Amino acid sequence: MFALILFVSLACANEVAFKQWAATHNKVFANRAEYLYRFAVFLDNKKFVEANANTELNVFADMTHEEFIQTHLGMTYEVPETTSNVKAAVKAAPESVDWRSIMNPAKDQGQCGSCWTFCTTAVLEGRVNKDLGKLYSFSEQQLVDCDASDNGCEGGHPSNSLKFIQENNGLGLESDYPYKAVAGTCKKVKNVATVTGSRRVTDGSETGLQTIIAENGPVAVGMDASRPSFQLYKKGTIYSDTKCRSRMMNHCVTAVGYGSNSNGKYWIIRNSWGTSWGDAGYFLLARDSNNMCGIGRDSNYPTGVKLI
């Protein structure tokens, strides 16, 4: 009898926790069947969080890991062991850098594999503000619809999209070409800014990445974001997972700085999963930790920008 009472009490407590979580994250379920399914997924993720430090029941706690991977990444390729691509110039860099103050709030790619567009607009927005003192919000949807060198919601790469912006004579504003999270027909809008050149560095040097960020501003970087621990990342912690791969890139994010605290050295990185995930859309990643998640393997940034 006691065991039955305990079971019922735990079940009730779990459902209360789920309802509180759903209210916090404005979750609405289509019907009772979906509610029960998401509740079951939530309980599975709750067990994972209870067994793994530095994780939490965040906005993605009602998604299976398979669903998460299918809908929230957007770069899939392997960095070879050797590469002929250019290396970063390694110079003495400041102890810490933080470009968050020149950036827009983190955006949300939704259930579309368009991370490559968000890291591209982020580095363009950051560089324009850094060099020209103007903060714009550029159109990710224009890249999804118009950049034929990439694959819209099926993935892409910032090296391609930065070249597209240069060859297309710029990119328009988000307000003129708003984000839909689905691929559509390319539309013509007024372009506002362009890149005059871009660079891709794949040498794997974290010290080199520090120099790039310090000198050039925010950098679009590839990483392995496929671990369950990253899906359920706990804000304020320095992310580290020994099973995170250093050469298999599947997500593009924006490195905006680096620093250290009592828990270790870290990179400051802006994601494209909205402001409800992480720390207002940002996360800290272990730095000088054998290229954690491949952070230094694929860096992309504009070498110059101009207004049109």
UniProtKB/Swiss-Prot annotation:
SUPFAM superfamilies: Cysteine proteinases. Residues 14-92 form a propeptide. GO terms for biological process: immune response; positive regulation of apoptotic signaling pathway; proteolysis involved in protein catabolic process. PROSITE patterns: THIOL_PROTEASE_ASN, THIOL_PROTEASE_CYS, THIOL_PROTEASE_HIS. Its main location: cytoplasm. Coiled coil: none annotated. Cysteine protease which may be involved in pathogenicity. Belongs to the peptidase C1 family. This is Cysteine proteinase 3.
